[in-house]
Amino acid sequence: MKLTYQGEIPVKKNTQRISKHGGIYKPKNAADFEETIGWEWRLTRQEPVPGTFKIVSGAFYIPERKDLDGCLTSLLDALQYAGAIENDRLLRSINDLKKIPLEKGAQERLEITIEAYT
């Protein structure tokens, strides 16, 4: 499965908030990211990756201040939400994953290839 996304990538640790009534909710940018990743995946018309999986290659074009692991966690949660993977805990291997710092004002994006783990 190959996926390319262009837009803001939220960092996972900052995606849940507590309301004034004590409930937990996702901010709009995190919910929008999950929804958009789901549509991007559906548009590729690729089959879901069954069972365990590996990241063959991935590149996150993000600002220096963002953590790569937080962005990866957000992406895996979004892919699970969309049904592209069963569960993000089934990740078994990461072969090649890069963080490429952006110049100020440049657009964030990601490119990732995921395959079944054999």
Residue ranges of predicted features:
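Acidic, proline/glycine-enriched N-terminal capping motif
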Residues: 1-118
